[in-house]
Design a protein with these regions (language model features):
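Conserved Switch II/interswitch segment of TRAFAC-class P-loop GTPases
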Residues: 162, 168-173, 181-199, 208-223
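Nucleotide-state-sensitive switch-loop elements of NTP-binding domains
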Residues: 46-51, 55-67, 87-179, 184-187
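Conserved lysine of the Walker
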Residues: 80
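Hydrophobic positions on the alpha1 helix immediately C-terminal to the Walker A/P-loop
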Residues: 83
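Extreme N-terminal, non-catalytic leader segments
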Residues: 2-69
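Canonical P-loop GTPase G-domain recognition
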Residues: 2-15, 202, 206-275
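Catalytic alpha/beta active-site cores
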Residues: 366, 370-701, 706-707, 725, ...
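Flexible, glycine-rich loop/tail regions that form catalytic "lids" or insertion modules at the edges
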Residues: 274-476, 558, 787, 792-798, ...
């Protein structure tokens, strides 16, 4: 990485920024629309001598109008850039066509001479062509503004901008340099200014036209606002002015459509002669995602778990005491009556525990009979409790302990118990299904047909279809295929391109999505509600197609239905409605019946974990509050429409681990995120027993010792919390999770060794009763998996499940001393992490300070250091290296041979044309549907309910843009 940086900086340093060849385009008047030329003039303003700059500026001048200049200043970290971005959104909304220039100054570091110039990462409004932004370094100015800022302002005026904003770097108490270059000034601060006497020292409170108290949601802000009002009144002798008339506004710039920012724009717009159509709103109580009284939920959970173990330990001691007293009676009959009295006193306190012991012994006896019947959702399952080996040994499928000590047995029941019994440490079901393996294989590349063929290849000959879908980065960010180079290059690469409902129909065609043996997993987060609506509509329209076929009205697929030949095993099902809408093929009553039946039947999972995206990955597209609202709307829709077999979220630790977290951090952050969703959904009035069954989890498995117990610790913490803290029912107490073997453990060096690592990880997952498993292909360190590597990866778990005698017993980890020790150790570490997050205001509070991301980065760096210095041995990478291995450098590039999976230009073009054709076909219906969607969002309705209709006529990118305007874009911190 350092070599790449030095190479790039070396090339950049050779460029003469004000050389003649760069300035050749400056031949005449330049306007605000000529962004490249404006950039050249601003470069001249920073680098050229006074004479050269003045002559070139006059040569390029196109305007002499008077342009207002607004100065934006404030303390570092007060949120100036975020506030400026929110103002830009309002300016563009209320004054379309007005050209605005932003000149943002960042401090130059004395030691390196460099400046971050990072304010633009906070600016979501920059995509508008009416807005121009230039970052400037303060260089040797010695203050918060650049020495040549006045020149840059001259340029902006000369080319005809209508409004100029100048943002300074963070300032101290005595600074007011912005007033020397700006007509009007805003001072942005937060509640963290110290004692109230510190306000006396702040120069800008004397001179700023508007004072902004940002981050008003923070604790102490109301008191800070009162103190600032008092100070401004004293400074300016405004004692008779009402609070709302003071030039002071409280804002939450991080909150989209914040009424405080609306109020600020109302005060600012008359000062610059711009329109302001936003209604004035009184700053009232603002509702957070988590209610204030529940902000310490993670501490409550930690206390609940510890209290649970402590109480059961006391009960175990009493059981042990009773047992000892009974023994004493036998040996000292003379005091039997006194002992009976003591026993009876204790028995009253432990009656429930004695019943648990009796139930367990009855269960153990049933297991010994060789056959056992249990129920799942009222459906009986009768299983054999033993299996016979080739040597004719009769092996228990579930091995149970034979403790003689009642206290020891009770402690085991309270901490472990048999699989399928609270606290579900060993598994949420009594036995695994032998007729259904939990194998999932990830696929996604190119156009929908290409991935569909891979799905059919993986499913050929399988009784159960388990599809796991990877999407390209264009889809992951909610965009449509386009010719823009940064989009075109990513279309269909490392994932499938899906932009319309028809694409989803093609992708899953040939599979009956309502078959009880079919399940679909979708790895999508930012635009997950839109993709989910595509999927559910595809499933509904499949059943419409089946209904019509049963009536003898089979649909002949249109020419646009499928490109290329159908793969082996594809019967054409699902292609009849491509290019057609199911609700237009049958009457409304029939459609409603089929829709209801489909929603209650379809099986699968959508990842949709927006908290994890903010903490570890990067595909957040909507503002976090709006993204969480969408998640809540999806879950409410599931409750309202009896969606019982589909998970509304896969709370994911996998990507946290892939970003570098160790197994304890992965587990702690993931469970914390899960409990945050629980608190949020409960705050919306949802019944925990209605939504908890729709929650699933997703973990990574590596080779660290803690991975041995990651699932069992998760199940125990979840079950105890659900029962003891939330009062949830048995089904809600059962945590179900998917495991994917570690992608981070795959190495490009000696890639054949990767299958060995994956096999060990798969064995851990199967031993720990993971509900489903994906094994990575060995070549994923280099490319999207090929058919050959995927087949090998699938074979790994088939061999472990079907050939390994060890896995014939389904709870092999129980009873091992080291497993017990690891389980308690990891659980304790997770609870400590819960408390660390709680001290930072819960998951959302910790996210604001980037606690989770910082912790992940620290742990990743620790791992990389150990790997690079050899302390952590990686076979074939830093030890046991092959002297004859292929070298990975430019000298061997032409000799490198490996099949690489990439989307072809033809596939990219097909994706683009299909999307454009669909948009053209729908025409006015699309705009009408998008406006209706926005209205539902503005009114606080269920957005997903409306999305189920919108996706029938609008593409992914169209819907994303529409939701940006009512829900806001995600604003990046880094």
């Amino acid at each position: 990485l350092m070599g790449m940086i030095h190479h790039l900086m070396g090339q950049a340093a050779e460029v003469d920024l004000i050389g003649k060849e760069r300035m050749n385009s400056l031949t005449g008047p330049v306007t605000a629309q000529d962004m490249a030329e404006v950039g050249l003039l601003l470069t001249l303003s920073e680098s050229a001598d006074e004479g050269t700059f003045k002559s070139m500026l006059e040569k390029c001048r196109s305007s002499d109008k008077d342009v207002p200049v607004i100065g934006f200043t404030g303390t570092g970290g007060a949120g100036k850039s975020s506030l400026l971005d929110e103002l830009m959104l309002r300016i563009q909304r209320d004054n379309p066509g007005k050209k605005v220039c932003l000149l943002c100054v960042d401090p130059t570091r004395k030691r390196t001479g460099g400046a971050l110039l990072g304010d633009r990462i906070r600016m979501n409004s920059l995509s508008n062509n009416d807005l121009y932004m230039r970052s400037l370094a303060s260089r040797g100015s010695g203050s918060e503004i650049s020495a040549n800022l006045d020149r840059a302002i001259e340029v902006a005026k000369a080319v005809g901008f209508d409004l100029i904003f100048c943002e300074t770097s963070g300032i101290g108490q005595g600074s007011d340099a912005i007033t020397s270059v700006a007509d009007r000034s805003l001072y942005v601060m937060t509640a963290e200014f110290g004692a109230h006497t510190q306000l006396e020292k702040i120069e800008m409170l004397d001179v700023a036209d508007v004072v902004v108290l940002n981050k008003y949601e923070k604790r102490g802000s109301e008191d800070a606002l009162r103190a600032i009002r008092k100070q401004v009144r004293r400074n300016r002798n405004m004692f008779d002015v009402a609070d709302e008339e003071l030039p002071i506004v409280a804002t939450i710039a991080s909150q989209f459509a914040d009424p405080g920012v609306d109020a600020l724009w109302q005060k600012l717009s008359p000062l610059v002669g711009f329109e302001s159509r936003a209604p004035m709103e009184i700053l009232g109580e603002r509702k957070g995602v988590i209610p204030p009284e529940r902000v310490h939920y993670l501490s409550d959970i930690s206390a609940t778990i510890r209290d649970y173990h402590e109480a059961n330990s006391e009960v175990a001691q009493k059981l042990r005491l009773c047992q000892h007293l009974e023994t004493a009676k036998e040996h000292v009959p003379s005091v039997a009556s006194d002992i009976d009295e003591q026993i009876n006193e204790v028995l009253e306190e432990i009656q429930e525990a004695r019943e648990s012991l009796a139930s367990y012994r009855e269960l153990a006896e049933q297991y010994r009979t060789g056959e056992y019947t249990y129920h799942v959702r009222g459906k009986p399952f009768t299983v054999q409790t033993t299996t016979e080996s080739l040597a004719h040994s009769n092996i228990s499928r579930v091995a149970l302990p034979n403790f003689a000590d009642d206290g020891e047995l009770f402690e085991w029941l309270s901490k472990e118990n048999a699989p399928g019994y609270f606290p579900y440490t060993a598994g949420v079901f009594p036995f695994k299904r032998t007729d259904e393996l939990s194998a999932r294989m990830f696929a996604g590349e190119g156009e929908p047909e290409r991935t569909n063929r891979r799905f059919h290849y993986l499913s050929l000959g399988q009784d159960y279809v388990r599809l796991s879908t990877a999407f390209d980065s264009v889809t992951l960010y909610g965009r449509d295929p386009a010719l823009r180079p940064d989009i075109w290059g990513k279309v269909g690469n490392s994932g499938v391109s899906i932009a319309t409902c028809d694409d989803a129909k093609r992708l899953y065609s040939g599979f009956d999505l309502c078959d009880s043996n079919t399940s679909v997993s979708m790895t999508i987060n930012g635009p997950a509600p839109i993709i989910l609506a595509f999927f559910l509509n595809a499933a509904i329209d499949q059943q419409i197609e089946k209904h019509l076929a049963e009536k003898g009205e089979s649909l002949e697929p249109l020419d646009v239905a499928y490109r290329g030949e159908l793969p082996e095993g594809h019967n054409g099902f699902g292609l009849g409605t491509v290019g057609r809408r199911g609700d237009e093929l049958v009457d409304a009553e029939t459609y409603a019946e089929i829709k209801a039946r489909t929603l209650s039947t379809v099986r699968g999972t959508v990842q949709a974990d927006i908290l994890k995206e903010d903490q570890a990955q990067n595909t957040c597209i909507f503002s976090t509050p709006f993204a969480l609202k969408l998640m809540g709307d999806v879950q409410q829709y599931y409750i309202d429409h009896n969606v019982r077999n589909h998970y509304s979220v896969s709370i994911s630790g996998y990507h946290i681990a892939e970003a570098g977290a160790n197994p304890i951090t992965q587990l702690a952050l993931t469970l914390a995120n899960g409990f945050t969703y629980v608190e949020y959904y409960r705050s919306r009035g949802m019944d925990i027993d209605k939504f908890a069954p729709n929650l699933s989890f997703f973990f990574s498995n590596g080779l660290d010792p803690e991975y041995t117990v990651i699932g069992r610790v998760a199940r125990r913490i979840w079950a105890v919390t659900m029962r003891e803290l939330y009062g949830a029912n048995e089904r809600s107490q059962k945590l179900k999770y998917h495991i994917q073997t570690s992608g981070r453990s795959l190495h490009a060096q000696e890639i054949d060794f990767n299958d060995i690592r994956t096999t060990l990880q798969a064995l851990l997952a199967i031993q720990d009763n993971a509900n489903s498993l994906h094994t990575n292909a060995y070549d994923e360190a280099i490319t999207t998996p090929t058919e050959e590597s995927v087949r090998r990866a699938l074979a790994i778990q088939l061999i472990v499940n079907k050939e390994s005698g060890w896995t014939k017993t389904e709870n092999p980890l129980q009873g091992a001393f080291i497993v017990d020790e690891l389980t308690d150790l990891v659980e304790a570490a997770v609870l400590e992490e819960f408390e660390a997050i709680s001290r930072r205001g819960g998951v959302l509070g910790a996210m604001e300070t980037m606690y989770q991301r910082g912790k992940i980065q620290d742990e990743s760096m620790y791992y990389e250091h150990l790997k690079h210095d050899g302390t952590l041995p990686i076979i074939g990478v830093n030890t046991f290296q092959n002297p004859n291995a292929q070298v990975f450098d430019e000298s061997s590039a032409d000799d490198f041979e490996m099949e690489l999976a990439r989307a072809t230009p033809d596939e990219k073009q097909a994706c683009l044309e299909r999307t454009e054709d669909r948009q053209t076909k729908e025409g006015d219906a699309t705009q009408k549907a998008l406006l209706q969607l926005q209205e539902v969002a503005r009114s606080g309705g269920n957005v997903f309910d409306e999305l189920m209709e919108t996706v029938k006529v609008a593409s992914l990118g169209q819907i994303t843009d529409a939701l940006f305007r009512v829900g806001g874009q995600y604003r990046r911190n880094m």
